[in-house]
Design a protein with these regions (language model features):
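Post-HExxH zinc-binding segment in Zn-dependent metallohydrolases
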Residues: 1-10, 148-193, 260-268
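N-terminal mature-domain "stem" immediately C-terminal to a signal peptide or N-terminal signal-anchor/transmembrane
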Residues: 1-41
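Pan-zinc metallopeptidase signature
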Residues: 16-19, 25, 194-277
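Auxiliary, metal-adjacent structural segments of Zn-dependent hydrolase domains
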Residues: 51-107, 118-121
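Short pre-active-site segment immediately N-terminal to the catalytic Zn-binding motif
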Residues: 113-128
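Active-site recognition of the HExxH zinc-binding catalytic motif
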Residues: 126-142, 155-159
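Inter-helical turn/loop segments and adjacent helix faces that build the functional surface
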Residues: 139-149, 168-174, 238, 242-244
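Active-site metal-coordination segments of metallo-dependent hydrolases
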Residues: 144-155, 217-221
């Protein structure tokens, strides 16, 4: 609110608005890499015109989140067979007006999840499910760090849990994409899977961000989500339960991803439905 009010009071131009955002807010759904600041500036400029009509909801703070975060976390934990408490630090923030929820990983046994206030109740339900899946899965599996292969598993599982607990939407809603993107993903899947398999062992923020935000050699952006949707979909259709997936260690998940990619590449009709149990 301080950032917004100051920008309005000063009639700030885009450059001054960015300075105020940096000094008073500086919180965005961008990767921790040098290009992240450029992305944050572009997001702010694109979203600014939408702020006024959303201010009444933003002023509610965490009370604007619906369904109940506790209720949704419980549902995710039960589906994934959580065996023990799951500790969450929930941050309600002003995002980009385009479903920009994200997870900040686990520290001292607590997962930090950020959910945009300005989104609709439907988007809150979808995104809390997705991000809470990350929290439950990483805590139950004892994950630390991330590789490209483990990111494929994590994002694939989150999209499929979101599908299970929020049924009835087109598949692209679960992958947070356009229908055209999902069609391109499906058409280019062999190339995407080849690339993810080749780079699966790569780790670190820079390596993972390339496949999470960037565009790969197959010409598809967000290859981790593209591959993850189909890879975990195949695991589920092969009879692996959500609870088994939810408790996998990072090493187990990475191995399962590699084996499933091989299975998908040898099949002429990759699984597009979860077949979940």
């Amino acid at each position: 609110m301080d950032f917004y009010n100051s920008s309005i009071t000063e009639h700030a131009d885009p450059d001054r608005r960015w300075e105020l955002w940096k000094s008073k807010y500086d919180f965005a759904a961008v990767p921790p890499i040098p290009a992240g600041q450029k992305m944050a500036r572009e997001q702010l400029d694109a979203a600014w015109a939408k702020y006024p009509e959303a201010m009444s909801q933003i002023r509610l703070g965490a009370a604007a989140l619906s369904p109940s975060p506790q209720q949704r976390l419980t549902e995710v934990a039960e589906l994934l067979g959580a065996q023990g408490p799951v500790r969450i630090r929930l941050i309600a923030f002003v995002g980009t007006f385009r479903r920009s929820a994200f997870s900040m990983g686990v520290k001292d046994g607590v997962s930090t999840i950020a959910i945009p206030l300005e989104d609709s109740a439907q988007d809150h339900a979808l995104d809390m499910t997705h991000e809470f899946t990350h929290a439950v899965q990483m805590q139950q599996g004892g994950w630390t760090g991330q590789s490209v292969a483990s990111a494929v598993f994590a994002e694939g599982l989150a999209t499929r849990v979101t599908e299970r607990l929020n049924p009835g939407f087109p598949a692209n809603i679960y992958t947070t994409s356009s229908s055209a993107w999902l069609e391109r993903c499906n058409a280019s899947l062999p190339q995407v899977l080849d690339e993810l398999r080749e780079h699966g062992a790569n780790s670190g923020a820079q390596a993972v961000s390339k496949f999470t935000y960037g565009t790969g050699t197959a010409g598809i952006d967000r290859e981790v989500y593209c591959g993850g949707w189909f890879v975990v979909g195949r695991m589920l259709s092969d009879g692996v339960s959500f609870s088994t997936l939810g408790r996998m260690t990072q090493a187990e998940a990475e191995g399962k991803v590699a084996a499933t990619i091989d299975s998908l590449l040898s099949s002429s009709t990759p699984a597009t439905k979860s077949g979940s149990r």
